[in-house]
Amino acid sequence: MEGLLAQLCGTDAARPLPLWEGDTTGHCFTQLVLSALPHALLAVLSACHLGTPRTTNHSPALNPGWRLRLAASFLLSIFPLLDLLPVVLPPGSRPGPLWLEVLAGCVTAVAWFTHSLALWALVHSPHGRSRGPLALALAAFLPTPALVLTLLWHCQRGTFLPPLLPGPLGRVCLLILQLAAVLAYGLGWAAPGGPQEPWTHDPFLSSESQETEVAEDGESWLSRFSYAWLAPLLARGVRGELQQPRDTCRLPRRLHPAFLARVFQAHWKEGAQLWRALYRAFGCCYLALGLLKMVGTMLGFSGPLLLSLLVGFLEEGQEPLSHGLLYVLGLAGGTVISAVLQNQYGYEVRKVTLQARVAVLSTLYRKALKLGPSRPPTGEVLNLLGTDSERLLNFAGSFHEAWGLPLQLAITLYLLYQQVGMAFLAGLVLALLLVPVNKVIATRIMASNQEMLRHKDARVKLMTELLSGIRVIKFFRWEQALGDRVKACRTKELGRLRVIKYLDAACVYLWAALPVVICITIFITYVLMGHQLTATKVFTALALVRMLILPLNNFPWVINGLLESKVSLDRIQRFLDLPSYSPEAYYSPDPPAEPSTALELHEALFSWDPIGASQKTFISHLQVKKGMLVGIVGKVGCGKSSLLAAITGELHRLCGWVAVSELSKGFGLATQEPWIQCATIRDNILFGKTFDAQLYREVLEACALNDDLSILPAGDQTEVGEKGVTLSGGQRARIALARAVYQEKALYLLDDPLAAVDADVANHLLHRCILGVLSHTTRLLCTHRTEYLERADVVLLMEAGQLVRTGPPSEILPLVQAVPTAWAEKEQVATSGQSPSVCDLERTTEEELEVEQSTCGCLVQEESKSEGAVALHVYRAYWRAMGSGLAAAILVSLLLMQATRNGADWWLAHWLSQLKAGRNGSREDPASCSPGSTALFSPRLLLFSPGNLYTPLLSTPLHKAASNGTADVHFYLIVYATIAGVNSLCTLLRAVLFAAGALQAAASLHHRLLHRLLMAPVTFYDSTPSGRVLNRFSSDVACVDDSLPFLLNILLANSVGLLGLLAVLGSGLPWLLLLLPPLSFVYYSVQGYYRASFRELRRLGSLTWSPLYSHLADTLAGLPVLRAAGATYRFEEENQRLLELNQRCQFASYATMQWLDIRLQLMGAAVVSAIAGIALVQHQQGLANPGLVGLVLSYALSLTGLLSGLVSSFTQTEAMMVSVERLEEYSCDVPQEPHSQPLQSPHQQRISWLTQGSVEFQDVVLVYRPGLPNALDGVTFRVEPGEKLGIVGRTGSGKSSLFLVLFRLLEPNAGRVLLDNVDTSQLELAELRSQLAVIPQEPFLFSGTIRENLDPQGLHEDRALWQALEQCHLSEVAVAMGGLDGELGERGQNLSLGQRQLLCLARALLTDAKILCIDEATASVDQKTDQLLQQTICKRFANKTVLTIAHRLNTILNSDRVLVLQAGRVVELDSPSALRNQPHSLFQQLLQSSQQGAHSGPSGC
């Protein structure tokens, strides 16, 4: 090496690279070190910018600065080549040897040519509007000192003095021209550039039409390795422009969901094993990364080994210089290559993880679209999407570690064998003995994990139901009861989590304490084998055993990750193995035999479960001709809806066959419970179909929606909220019907669309829609309002799941009507069992929200997102949640743990100094009295640990010199073992305390969130999609439970580790602390630049999860409608679009993590390499102190590793704290229902304040938002105790607002409400609602038993429950389901809609409330049952005050008085007979129109 260098430079082999020649630097040193190396760096940096994405618009005009820089760069690439021409002249005319000049000139020319190309690329990118990257410009000036020094060299050589030789003079002229070109380049860079082009026009951003560039694709390999392509994204993050998912860069082609779905589907088929399909799709690429992992792992050992060799070279001083140079270059190169390889490995593994993630999530959604009748609860499916998919994909990071860590272990053990021989087996046996212990722990963790996930499923499912029925829960004051159920699930979940956390703590403690125990065991064995312990053996063994910490500590986590992946894989596989909806297998492949037949069923038996255990539906034979109107009637729960579900394929067909004509065109389906999307009314009706203005107008008219749209603030552009929350029941039914009609199908299945509307609207729907627009189609209509079936072609009578009669209406209808032909007698309206109702009086469930919406019609606001660093109050909130005392104890235990660890290091240093003092003059330390060399062994022997290794302190030898006898060794070992034991106890204490603190924080944060949300007003839920709330209860809570404590633990360990290292540095080598400020500044700048983007990307990632949750929940709710309309493909595309937005944020956050990692790694490598290089130069000058150099190198290695870990763990912890921030946002900022002051005499008045039941409204005004019209405008009336009051009025008249104000779900702006002369605003909400009862129009049931649904608070005996069921005609159903403990299923799915309404009525029968509010709750029951129920209500509540929002006239005309509302005012209040006798009363007009509606039904018969 020296010879080659001497030959290249023309120097002596003893000094091949002289630093000084005369009064200036050596020419060879100048050309190689000061010129060639900076030019090589310039070439590399320039190459990184060659792939800079171009702008999409036309090329901008070059400003003068860019032109000057381009021209200067091009000239600087030409001049070195011209400079080579004088080289051919005689030797005297050139300053250095031939090949040195050729090498330097070629490197310079290539560098500037590459730089010219890079500038050209930057000019045509958004950088063209500014000066471009600063780093690139600074690199261009790095070679300038070499030019200046070469010019000085010429001056010293007298090149300008006569005789002037043409060769040297020409070279000087070219040198001056090069300096001038560099100056011109500087002026070009200094010229003012315009403001940087806004990135909103960048192809990385904004609308799809402009997004032509894709992240990473098309970039150079240098740009990929350095992540230079991320610069625009990071710049936007620093400027605060990462506001929405589209602000991130587009996905590379290999990560796009559409591409990945195609790749995965090629290997996936129904019933296949998920892991096999994933392996076939992505396995080869993933396994190939193992090679990268292995090379990176092997190179990881090069650093410590080469450092040891370098210290040996400096210490011995006998090896040639070339060896030292090779060690330094090997150290630098090995560290850099290892950093790049390991970084690329991490990046590629994350990319494979993202690929598999899209495949899994797409497959889950596709399966959800194909689910058969046996469907898991929505909460469980959401958990598969949020929790299990993430845990499954942790496999990607764990698998390669599972073999990589044992490889590191094997290499370390081999090196240990080299030091202590067979004694290392004693330590190995001890380590192996802990494996079965670890196996037991891992098995317990896995079992607890499965149980915890089951409890989590139950909790999320319960929350889903709770959110869907929050209005009824508040009416019935069940917040406490259902909140307790959620808390019970959470307690069970935390119980399993507690087991997991403490087992994890035990696992970590065992492996953390293991190295010390292994060391002591090895040393004792070594002595017993008859060997003499020496400092060399002790410290080398300690260093090597410390290298075992990483693989031994990480291995349990890796195994745990693999086990968790297996658990989640099994859960996902079970979901994927559920029976699928298969039209090909369900329907007969042949159409009906007769062309005129639309539908035919023969000997068909159906059930909701595949084995027929639930109620069956049997159709012996049914043939429906094309164009017929078929009515389906029967008692509640007889199987009417099941028949329609059987036709649409939503049941299991056990036998027989079903044939449908033109099956591929699908069905027009209007379900009994209307399914409405969170979108505008127009979007709900169009349902993905192209807008046809003429057809759209016809559909609106046919479905009687024009009047409703004229009331709504933005017409058909009004957003209706999740599940149509801002609409009345009738409006939802009509929009669902309009959606079906707009699809223009041949076969329509209409499940009771007339139940929720009044007689006039029902009449309109019958004549304009069912008999009008749909007259040319085949229609099957289920209804209890039999008066509207007189025009049917045929009527089917269902009973107990069987089709018992088929015939014309005149035969079938009398069998089910309460009073036949009730419409025949006009004068018997008041007493007949028929139910005429008031024109256009359907209830508006959410009148307040209809008004509350802004004129743009937008109800649901974009989810808010915090910006900037995670605020300090979030950390304080987590501290408080953990408990101040517990948090302080954790910090104290951490500091004690670090102090004892440093104490152990100090004791080792003291032992070494005593050994060296006792062996003064030995060959190993001829200068033991020198303070600088007292720790000579420590750097040499402790360099094997690449991180978190604290080299012993440089301690002054004590006055007492110790011998190296065995007794002394034993003494030092005992003291060391004692200190290590104390450290072990502190470690255990810290692990246990931290587990307890994490559990306390998890419990506290969830409790606060749940309590706050249960106390939120209904307006919050109406404007907040449930997906947002569920996202917090699922993903964010899971993060607080698991991910955050794990990362916070690492952060705290790194922090106290850094404090301990700084303490060692400050006492051992104080001058080294001078390097910390600049190093800290660089680290802080890099991580600050990174954190600004990563924070926002993490938030955007959380933000884009919520729509995925909502979309999946929405899909599961509307599955029959989707499939009937053939919209599954469109919904799958929407899922891919939402998934792409989330994938963008995930990919960008992963890429930014790797961007930070490579920079921190390279900075650490640069620090170590620079110190090694300086040491080599000092060694050549005879100034190096080997011991000091070794210390510096080992400290540098530990310090950079710790700083990297600290930045990384802090950033990831901050990202996880976003989950705490989101929980705190809802725990603190969600509005709360008002809490009133207690009454003056709480004991007496609270018991007896409502004894009679009078209700009085006094000038009540309700305004939902300033500037909007009054919903209630000075309403005044009084209801006497025991009085029955009917409430009627048109849509938007304020009927529902009365109930909302009465129950204080909304607070009035003026006026007051009195109950028995007590102002309700002075009462606590629970106190008020406990005295009121409500029967809602829409039934709400939650999963659980009949008992839990009837009496959630457990206040009544079984006898009372059975009595209520008997009165509601549900006792037989309850017995068939297994009595009061029979399960109802999710949202009561085991009951028909009518049976659910009856069960809600049974609740009201149990109440002791003095005031009952009824919102016509029997719309979905047959007329005979309805008549009996009305009699039951009249009898049961005879002495109670009853307020009824009327839909059927029998509930009004039997009332004592009727209240008529119009535009929020009371216009009439009198008895029904008095109002009917007033010829111009509004009530009389409504009554007349309702009678006309009733008569028009059969008029055509």
From Swiss-Prot:
Residues that coordinate or bind ATP 2: G1289, R1290, T1291, G1292, S1293, G1294, K1295, S1296
Chain positions recorded as ATP 1 binding sites: G634, K635, V636, G637, C638, G639, K640, S641
Catalyzed reactions per annotation: ATP + H2O + xenobioticSide 1 = ADP + phosphate + xenobioticSide 2; an S-substituted glutathione(in) + ATP + H2O = an S-substituted glutathione(out) + ADP + phosphate + H(+); 17beta-estradiol 17-O-(beta-D-glucuronate)(in) + ATP + H2O = 17beta-estradiol 17-O-(beta-D-glucuronate)(out) + ADP + phosphate + H(+); leukotriene C4(in) + ATP + H2O = leukotriene C4(out) + ADP + phosphate + H(+)
Name this protein carries in UniProt: ATP-binding cassette sub-family C member 10
Function in brief: ATP-dependent transporter of the ATP-binding cassette (ABC) family that actively extrudes physiological compounds, and xenobiotics from cells. Lipophilic anion transporter that mediates ATP-dependent transport of glucuronide conjugates such as estradiol-17-beta-o-glucuronide and GSH conjugates such as leukotriene C4 (LTC4). Does not transport glycocholic acid, taurocholic acid, MTX, folic acid, cAMP, or cGMP. May contribute to regulate the transport of organic compounds in testes across the blood-testis-barrier.
Cellular localization per UniProt: Cell membrane; Basolateral cell membrane; Basal cell membrane
Organism: Mus musculus (Mouse)
GO cellular component terms given for this protein: basal plasma membrane; basolateral plasma membrane
Family to which this protein belongs: Belongs to the ABC transporter superfamily. ABCC family. Conjugate transporter (TC 3.A.1.208) subfamily.
ABC transporter domain location: 599-825, 1255-1488
Domain ABC transmembrane type-1 positions: 286-564, 887-1215
Transmembrane region(s): 32-52, 70-90, 102-122, 133-153, 172-192, 294-314, 321-341, 392-412, 415-435, 508-528, 539-559, 877-897, 969-989, 1033-1053, 1056-1076, 1158-1178, 1187-1207
Transport is among the record's keywords: yes
EC number(s) from the headed UniProt entry: 7.6.2.2, 7.6.2.3
Any GO molecular function: ABC-type xenobiotic transporter activity
CDD domains on file: ABC_6TM_MRP7_D1_like, ABC_6TM_MRP7_D2_like, ABCC_MRP_domain1, ABCC_MRP_domain2
Alphabetized InterPro entries for the sequence: AAA+_ATPase (IPR003593), ABC1_TM_dom (IPR011527), ABC1_TM_sf (IPR036640), ABC_transporter-like_ATP-bd (IPR003439), ABC_transporter-like_CS (IPR017871), ABC_transporter_C-like (IPR050173), P-loop_NTPase (IPR027417)
List of residues that carry Phosphothreonine: T464
Keyword set, alphabetical order: ATP-binding, Cell membrane, Lipid transport, Membrane, Nucleotide-binding, Phosphoprotein, Repeat, Translocase, Transmembrane, Transmembrane helix, Transport
Superkingdom field: Eukaryota
Membrane topology field: Multi-pass membrane protein
